[in-house]
Amino acid sequence: MSEYKQCIVTREDLKLSKGKFAVQVAHAAISASEWASKNDLEKWKEGGQKKIVLKVPTLNDLYELKEKARREGLPTALIQDAGLTEIPPGTVTVLGIGPAKEELIDKVTRNLKLV
C-alpha cells in the first residue's frame, strides 16, 4: 500500500519572521490540497496528513520545481503574499506539492533539504 504526503517548499532568499513563515506554509498546505484528486486527498487524510517542509535557494528554483511537479501530474499551489506586512505585494513565497503518493513527490523533491 502506498503512503501519501505533501511537501511545502520555501525560499531561502526570503527572510520572513517565524509567524509570516508559518502562515505562508499553511496557505500552501491548504491550497495545494484543494487541487488533489479526491482519492489522494482521502488516502492522505487516512494516513495522518504527512507534511514535509523543504527549501530551495531562489524563486527561480521554486518555479523549476513547480514545472517538474506539473510534468509528474502532481497538484501544486504557488503562494503569493498580499504584501500587507513584511514583503511587497505579489511576492511568491512558497510552493505546495501534493498530497499525492510519496514516491511521485519524491521524484521531484528528493534532493531538497529540510527547513
UniProtKB/Swiss-Prot annotation:
SUPFAM superfamilies: Peptidyl-tRNA hydrolase II. GO terms for molecular function: peptidyl-tRNA hydrolase activity. It is an enzyme of class 3 (hydrolase). The keyword Cytoplasm applies. Keywords: Cytoplasm, Hydrolase. Its EC number is 3.1.1.29. Gene3D superfamilies: Bit1. It holds the Pfam family PTH2. One of its GO terms (cellular component) is cytosol. It catalyses: an N-acyl-L-alpha-aminoacyl-tRNA + H2O = an N-acyl-L-amino acid + a tRNA + H(+). Belongs to the PTH2 family. The natural substrate for this enzyme may be peptidyl-tRNAs which drop off the ribosome during protein synthesis. PANTHER family: PEPTIDYL-TRNA HYDROLASE 2 (PTHR12649), PEPTIDYL-TRNA HYDROLASE 2, MITOCHONDRIAL (PTHR12649:SF11). This is Peptidyl-tRNA hydrolase. It comes from Methanosarcina barkeri (strain Fusaro / DSM 804). The lineage of its organism: Archaea, Methanobacteriati, Methanobacteriota, Stenosarchaea group, Methanomicrobia. The gene is pth.
